[in-house]
Amino acid sequence: AASDVYKRQAWIDAVEYTDGMSETNEDRHPKRDLALDTLMGVLNGEILVQNHCYRADEMAMMIELSKEFDYKITAFHHAVEAYKIADLLADEGICAALWADWWGFKHEAYDMVQANVAIVDQARNGTGCAIVHSDDPVGIQHLNEEAAKAMAAGNRAGFNISKAHAMRWITSNPAKAAGILDQTGSIEVGKDADIVLWSGNPFSVYSRAEKVLIDGALAFDINDPKIQPITDFDLGIIQPEENRVQ
Protein backbone atom coordinates (compact mmCIF):
# COMPACT_ATOMS: atom_id res chain seq x y z
CA ALA A 1 0.00 0.00 0.00
CA ALA A 2 2.83 2.38 0.85
CA SER A 3 4.39 1.68 -2.54
CA ASP A 4 1.09 2.48 -4.28
CA VAL A 5 0.86 5.79 -2.43
CA TYR A 6 4.44 6.62 -3.43
CA LYS A 7 3.74 5.85 -7.11
CA ARG A 8 0.57 7.94 -7.13
CA GLN A 9 2.30 10.86 -5.40
CA ALA A 10 5.08 10.73 -8.00
CA TRP A 11 2.55 11.11 -10.80
CA ILE A 12 0.68 13.86 -8.97
CA ASP A 13 3.96 15.74 -8.68
CA ALA A 14 4.68 15.06 -12.35
CA VAL A 15 1.32 16.46 -13.48
CA GLU A 16 1.86 19.64 -11.44
CA TYR A 17 5.42 19.92 -12.77
CA THR A 18 4.24 19.43 -16.38
CA ASP A 19 1.54 22.06 -15.96
CA GLY A 20 4.10 24.46 -14.51
CA MET A 21 6.57 23.86 -17.32
CA SER A 22 3.85 24.54 -19.89
CA GLU A 23 3.51 28.12 -18.68
CA THR A 24 4.48 30.56 -21.42
CA ASN A 25 6.13 32.81 -18.84
CA GLU A 26 9.41 31.04 -18.04
CA ASP A 27 9.70 32.98 -14.79
CA ARG A 28 6.79 30.90 -13.51
CA HIS A 29 8.41 27.57 -14.35
CA PRO A 30 9.18 25.30 -11.38
CA LYS A 31 12.78 24.52 -10.44
CA ARG A 32 14.29 22.00 -12.87
CA ASP A 33 13.92 18.40 -11.64
CA LEU A 34 15.48 15.64 -13.75
CA ALA A 35 13.30 12.89 -12.27
CA LEU A 36 10.13 14.85 -12.99
CA ASP A 37 11.50 15.71 -16.44
CA THR A 38 11.37 12.00 -17.21
CA LEU A 39 7.79 11.60 -16.00
CA MET A 40 6.85 14.75 -17.91
CA GLY A 41 8.23 13.08 -21.03
CA VAL A 42 5.92 10.13 -20.38
CA LEU A 43 2.89 12.38 -19.85
CA ASN A 44 3.69 14.22 -23.09
CA GLY A 45 3.97 10.94 -25.00
CA GLU A 46 7.67 11.43 -25.71
CA ILE A 47 8.89 8.44 -23.66
CA LEU A 48 7.61 4.89 -24.03
CA VAL A 49 6.96 3.15 -20.72
CA GLN A 50 8.61 -0.25 -20.32
CA ASN A 51 7.04 -1.45 -17.06
CA HIS A 52 8.57 -4.25 -14.99
CA CYS A 53 5.86 -6.48 -13.47
CA TYR A 54 5.50 -10.18 -12.73
CA ARG A 55 2.00 -10.61 -11.32
CA ALA A 56 -1.33 -10.07 -13.03
CA ASP A 57 -2.74 -7.95 -10.20
CA GLU A 58 0.30 -5.67 -10.34
CA MET A 59 -0.08 -5.20 -14.09
CA ALA A 60 -3.79 -4.46 -13.74
CA MET A 61 -3.01 -1.93 -11.01
CA MET A 62 -0.43 -0.19 -13.20
CA ILE A 63 -2.92 -0.04 -16.08
CA GLU A 64 -5.43 1.66 -13.78
CA LEU A 65 -2.74 4.09 -12.64
CA SER A 66 -1.84 4.90 -16.26
CA LYS A 67 -5.48 5.68 -17.01
CA GLU A 68 -5.78 7.88 -13.92
CA PHE A 69 -2.85 10.01 -15.05
CA ASP A 70 -3.45 9.65 -18.78
CA TYR A 71 -0.24 7.99 -19.93
CA LYS A 72 0.39 4.90 -22.02
CA ILE A 73 2.17 1.71 -20.98
CA THR A 74 3.93 0.27 -24.01
CA ALA A 75 5.07 -3.06 -22.56
CA PHE A 76 5.27 -5.11 -19.39
CA HIS A 77 8.55 -6.96 -18.93
CA HIS A 78 8.95 -10.41 -17.35
CA ALA A 79 5.14 -10.54 -16.90
CA VAL A 80 5.08 -14.15 -15.67
CA GLU A 81 1.31 -13.97 -15.07
CA ALA A 82 0.44 -12.12 -18.28
CA TYR A 83 -1.68 -15.07 -19.47
CA LYS A 84 -4.21 -14.28 -16.72
CA ILE A 85 -4.97 -10.85 -18.21
CA ALA A 86 -4.12 -11.52 -21.86
CA ASP A 87 -7.41 -10.06 -23.12
CA LEU A 88 -6.91 -6.91 -21.06
CA LEU A 89 -3.41 -6.45 -22.48
CA ALA A 90 -4.73 -6.88 -26.02
CA ASP A 91 -7.58 -4.43 -25.37
CA GLU A 92 -5.12 -1.83 -24.07
CA GLY A 93 -2.58 -2.42 -26.85
CA ILE A 94 0.14 -3.34 -24.36
CA CYS A 95 2.92 -5.76 -25.30
CA ALA A 96 4.32 -8.34 -22.90
CA ALA A 97 8.01 -9.29 -23.02
CA LEU A 98 8.23 -12.82 -21.65
CA TRP A 99 10.56 -15.69 -20.95
CA ALA A 100 9.84 -18.88 -22.83
CA ASP A 101 10.09 -21.19 -19.84
CA TRP A 102 11.82 -19.59 -16.88
CA TRP A 103 9.95 -19.01 -13.64
CA GLY A 104 9.74 -20.05 -10.00
CA PHE A 105 12.93 -18.33 -8.87
CA LYS A 106 11.13 -16.02 -6.44
CA HIS A 107 7.67 -15.69 -4.92
CA GLU A 108 6.12 -13.37 -7.50
CA ALA A 109 7.44 -15.54 -10.34
CA TYR A 110 5.82 -18.81 -9.23
CA ASP A 111 2.54 -18.90 -11.15
CA MET A 112 3.50 -19.26 -14.82
CA VAL A 113 2.41 -21.61 -17.60
CA GLN A 114 4.55 -22.66 -20.56
CA ALA A 115 1.94 -21.36 -23.00
CA ASN A 116 2.26 -17.85 -21.54
CA VAL A 117 3.70 -16.35 -24.73
CA ALA A 118 1.14 -18.06 -26.96
CA ILE A 119 -1.83 -17.09 -24.78
CA VAL A 120 -0.80 -13.42 -24.82
CA ASP A 121 -0.20 -13.60 -28.58
CA GLN A 122 -3.54 -15.22 -29.38
CA ALA A 123 -5.70 -13.01 -27.14
CA ARG A 124 -8.65 -11.26 -28.78
CA ASN A 125 -8.44 -13.25 -32.00
CA GLY A 126 -4.68 -12.99 -32.31
CA THR A 127 -4.34 -9.26 -31.70
CA GLY A 128 -2.08 -9.61 -28.66
CA CYS A 129 1.53 -8.44 -28.70
CA ALA A 130 3.91 -11.06 -27.29
CA ILE A 131 7.69 -10.76 -27.17
CA VAL A 132 10.17 -13.49 -26.32
CA HIS A 133 12.96 -11.81 -24.41
CA SER A 134 16.00 -12.59 -22.33
CA ASP A 135 17.88 -10.44 -19.88
CA ASP A 136 20.60 -13.08 -19.70
CA PRO A 137 23.86 -12.73 -21.68
CA VAL A 138 23.81 -16.40 -22.66
CA GLY A 139 20.10 -16.74 -23.39
CA ILE A 140 20.08 -13.69 -25.65
CA GLN A 141 22.44 -15.53 -28.01
CA HIS A 142 19.82 -18.26 -28.40
CA LEU A 143 16.73 -16.08 -28.67
CA ASN A 144 15.57 -17.93 -31.78
CA GLU A 145 15.62 -21.17 -29.80
CA GLU A 146 13.72 -19.52 -26.94
CA ALA A 147 11.03 -18.48 -29.43
CA ALA A 148 10.94 -22.04 -30.77
CA LYS A 149 10.29 -23.37 -27.27
CA ALA A 150 7.47 -20.88 -26.74
CA MET A 151 5.94 -21.77 -30.11
CA ALA A 152 6.09 -25.50 -29.33
CA ALA A 153 4.46 -24.94 -25.92
CA GLY A 154 1.68 -22.93 -27.53
CA ASN A 155 1.00 -25.56 -30.15
CA ARG A 156 0.94 -28.28 -27.48
CA ALA A 157 -1.71 -26.19 -25.71
CA GLY A 158 -3.89 -26.27 -28.83
CA PHE A 159 -2.89 -23.09 -30.64
CA ASN A 160 -1.93 -23.26 -34.29
CA ILE A 161 1.10 -20.99 -34.44
CA SER A 162 3.25 -21.03 -37.55
CA LYS A 163 6.99 -20.40 -37.62
CA ALA A 164 6.42 -17.25 -39.66
CA HIS A 165 4.02 -15.93 -37.03
CA ALA A 166 6.28 -16.85 -34.09
CA MET A 167 9.12 -14.97 -35.76
CA ARG A 168 7.26 -11.76 -34.89
CA TRP A 169 7.99 -12.43 -31.22
CA ILE A 170 11.67 -11.65 -31.79
CA THR A 171 11.40 -9.17 -34.68
CA SER A 172 8.44 -6.86 -35.32
CA ASN A 173 6.86 -7.02 -31.86
CA PRO A 174 10.05 -5.94 -30.05
CA ALA A 175 10.46 -3.18 -32.62
CA LYS A 176 6.89 -2.08 -31.92
CA ALA A 177 7.52 -1.98 -28.16
CA ALA A 178 10.73 -0.01 -28.71
CA GLY A 179 8.91 2.50 -30.90
CA ILE A 180 11.02 1.77 -33.98
CA LEU A 181 8.67 -0.41 -36.03
CA ASP A 182 8.75 2.23 -38.75
CA GLN A 183 12.51 1.64 -39.08
CA THR A 184 13.08 -2.07 -38.49
CA GLY A 185 11.47 -5.32 -37.33
CA SER A 186 10.31 -6.53 -40.74
CA ILE A 187 11.61 -6.70 -44.29
CA GLU A 188 9.91 -3.84 -46.12
CA VAL A 189 10.90 -1.18 -48.62
CA GLY A 190 12.12 1.90 -46.79
CA LYS A 191 13.12 0.15 -43.57
CA ASP A 192 16.64 -0.51 -42.31
CA ALA A 193 17.94 -3.77 -43.77
CA ASP A 194 18.61 -5.54 -40.46
CA ILE A 195 18.62 -9.13 -41.66
CA VAL A 196 19.99 -12.53 -40.63
CA LEU A 197 20.42 -15.25 -43.26
CA TRP A 198 20.28 -18.73 -41.73
CA SER A 199 21.61 -22.05 -42.97
CA GLY A 200 18.21 -23.63 -42.31
CA ASN A 201 15.09 -23.28 -40.17
CA PRO A 202 15.82 -20.35 -37.82
CA PHE A 203 14.09 -22.23 -35.01
CA SER A 204 16.33 -25.27 -35.29
CA VAL A 205 19.29 -25.78 -32.95
CA TYR A 206 21.19 -27.12 -35.97
CA SER A 207 20.89 -23.89 -37.98
CA ARG A 208 23.64 -21.31 -37.98
CA ALA A 209 23.62 -17.65 -38.88
CA GLU A 210 25.52 -17.41 -42.18
CA LYS A 211 25.26 -13.68 -42.86
CA VAL A 212 24.16 -10.68 -40.81
CA LEU A 213 23.34 -7.31 -42.34
CA ILE A 214 22.92 -4.21 -40.20
CA ASP A 215 21.31 -1.28 -41.97
CA GLY A 216 22.16 -2.97 -45.25
CA ALA A 217 25.87 -3.37 -44.49
CA LEU A 218 27.36 -6.85 -44.20
CA ALA A 219 28.42 -7.17 -40.55
CA PHE A 220 29.05 -10.94 -40.39
CA ASP A 221 29.85 -13.64 -42.94
CA ILE A 222 30.49 -17.16 -41.72
CA ASN A 223 32.60 -17.86 -44.82
CA ASP A 224 34.76 -14.75 -44.59
CA PRO A 225 37.12 -14.47 -41.59
CA LYS A 226 37.57 -10.78 -42.36
CA ILE A 227 33.88 -10.16 -41.64
CA GLN A 228 33.59 -11.95 -38.32
CA PRO A 229 33.62 -9.46 -35.44
CA ILE A 230 35.70 -10.53 -32.48
CA THR A 231 33.87 -10.64 -29.16
CA ASP A 232 35.32 -10.87 -25.69
CA PHE A 233 32.22 -12.66 -24.45
CA ASP A 234 32.94 -16.24 -23.37
CA LEU A 235 30.17 -18.58 -24.46
CA GLY A 236 28.79 -20.58 -21.58
CA ILE A 237 28.88 -19.90 -17.88
CA ILE A 238 32.38 -20.34 -16.49
CA GLN A 239 33.05 -20.04 -12.79
CA PRO A 240 36.19 -18.15 -11.78
CA GLU A 241 39.00 -20.58 -11.05
CA GLU A 242 38.89 -19.91 -7.32
CA ASN A 243 35.19 -20.91 -7.23
CA ARG A 244 35.46 -24.12 -9.23
CA VAL A 245 34.82 -27.48 -7.61
CA GLN A 246 38.11 -29.36 -7.35
Enumerate the predicted regions with their spans.
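Short, small-residue-biased leader/transition segments that mark boundaries at the very start
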Residues: A1-Y6
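Flexible, glycine/charged-enriched surface loops at secondary-structure junctions
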Residues: Y17-A35, F76, T184-G185
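Hard-cation-handling environments
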Residues: M21, K31-T38, V42-L48, Y54
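His/Asp/Glu-enriched, well-ordered alpha-helical/loop segment
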Residues: L48, D87-A90, I94-W198, L218
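Catalytic beta/alpha-barrel core
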Residues: Q50-Y54, K72-E81, G104-K106
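Active-site environment of divalent metal-dependent phosphoester hydrolases
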Residues: A56-A60, A79-A86, G139-Q141
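Conserved, well-ordered alpha-helix/loop/beta-strand core segments that scaffold catalytic motifs
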Residues: A56-M61, L65-F69, T74
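C-terminal cap of metal-dependent C-N hydrolases
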Residues: E188-F233
